[in-house]
């Protein structure tokens, strides 16, 4: 996975490189302007510091949303998330300080999401073909067709892939949702109270 990290703190940039560089191609840039210059279709994931000189992380995320390619955008910030993140074109929001395990978990989540997206696209294409054939061919013709049987088998296999991509074993979902409070915590009403 190619990861672009836009972070104005040099020490933080070094940590990203140390933590992620062995497993991924990591490109480090010191600000939002450099991030926009470095961003190309080969970038799979973009870690953005929210408060950077030049273009802020929010401005970079807005610009990325206008691009034809669609890298995952993860905002990493010391700012407590507020309601303004609802409208931000980001895939994740991670509050600093971050550690290696959190970053790796975010990457795993994005990879799992990409696998699911790809499997789902293939599944829809196959089921569309199946529906088109079934709408035009008689039951008799369908029963005689080896291609139709192979297509049905491919649909079944792809359906299983989609189902397995929904619940990948390798993703630590407790980290994915660690910011989701339990009822009664941080102002969340308990519906059972």
What feature does the model see in each segment?
Residues 103-120:
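Receiver (REC) domain switch/output surface
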Residues 10-27, 31:
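Two-component/phosphorelay signaling modules centered on CheY-like receiver
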Residues 46-50:
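Active-site residues of response regulator receiver
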Residues 69-81, 94:
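A short, hydrophobic beta-strand element within the central beta-sheet of small alpha/beta folds
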Residues 116-193:
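C-terminal output/effector regions of signal-responsive regulators
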Residues 28-37, 57-59:
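Helix N-cap/capping motif at the beta->alpha junctions
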């Amino acid at each position: 996975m190619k990861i672009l990290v836009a972070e104005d703190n040099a020490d933080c940039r070094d940590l990203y490189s140390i933590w992620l560089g062995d497993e991924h191609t990591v490109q480090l840039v010191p600000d939002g302007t450099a991030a926009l210059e470095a961003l190309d279709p080969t970038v799979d994931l973009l870690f953005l510091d929210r408060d950077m000189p030049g273009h802020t992380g929010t401005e970079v995320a807005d610009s990325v949303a206008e691009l034809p390619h669609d890298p995952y955008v993860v905002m990493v910030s010391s700012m407590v998330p507020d309601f303004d993140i609802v409208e931000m074109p980001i895939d994740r929001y991670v509050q600093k300080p971050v550690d290696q395990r959190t970053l790796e978990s975010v990457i795993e989540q994005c990879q799992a999401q990409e696998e699911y997206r790809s499997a789902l696209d293939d599944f829809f294409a196959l089921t569309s073909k199946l529906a088109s054939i079934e709408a035009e061919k008689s039951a008799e013709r369908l029963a005689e067709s080896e291609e139709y049987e192979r297509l049905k088998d491919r649909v079944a296999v792809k359906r299983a892939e989609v189902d397995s991509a929904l619940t990948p074993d390798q993703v630590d979902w407790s980290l994915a949702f660690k910011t989701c409070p339990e009822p009664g915590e941080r102002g969340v009403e308990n519906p059972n109270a």
